[in-house]
């Protein structure tokens, strides 16, 4: 059953991410989808900080680097699949290695994920409602 939340600011979206973090148990994939500017990275700031893996201000979009690692001992990865076109791209970037050790993998643009899901997953859809408001749907 889907859960739906409305946030009215970036701070509320980040806070909701911290709440979600408390429910995550590795290994798990957090699959984020939503249009450009819908709040995927803002939500990730809350998740990563809620896990104690990094401070909010240290969490940035991996659009150009494609992957950020926030913790190695209990891995927390944040990837961006926007530029991934096919399995070959995914494989060439070594992204399959994310699943070599149980951890938490947060993927933006998850609709581009080219593999069967190797771990349990939480799907989160973000929608921009105008201004700073977002609809967050968790499946």
Describe the predicted segments one by one.
Residues 3-4, 85-139:
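Short phosphate-coordinating micro-motif centered on Lys-Gly-acidic
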Residues 33-35:
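P-loop (Walker A) phosphate-binding loop of NTP-binding proteins
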Residues 40:
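Conserved lysine of the Walker
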Residues 1-16:
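N-terminal pre-Walker A segment at the start of P-loop NTPase domains
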Residues 54-68:
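Short beta-strand-centered segment that lines the nucleotide-binding/catalytic pocket of NTP-utilizing
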Residues 29-31:
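Short hydrophobic/aromatic beta-strand immediately N-terminal to the Walker A/P-loop
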Residues 21-27:
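Phosphate-binding P-loop
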């Amino acid at each position: 059953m889907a859960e739906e939340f409305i946030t009215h600011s970036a701070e509320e979206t980040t806070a909701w991410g911290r709440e979600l973090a408390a429910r995550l148990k590795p290994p798990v994939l957090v699959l984020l989808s939503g249009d450009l500017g819908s709040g995927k990275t803002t939500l990730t700031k809350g998740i990563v900080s809620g896990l104690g893996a990094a401070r909010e201000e240290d969490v940035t979009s991996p659009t150009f680097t494609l992957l950020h690692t926030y913790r190695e001992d209990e891995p927390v990865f944040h990837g961006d699949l926007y530029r991934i076109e096919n399995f070959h791209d995914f494989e060439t970037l070594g992204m399959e290695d994310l699943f070599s050790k149980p951890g938490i993998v947060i993927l933006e643009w998850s609709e581009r994920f080219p593999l069967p899901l190797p771990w349990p997953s939480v799907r989160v859809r973000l929608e921009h409602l105008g201004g700073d408001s977002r609809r967050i749907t968790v499946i």
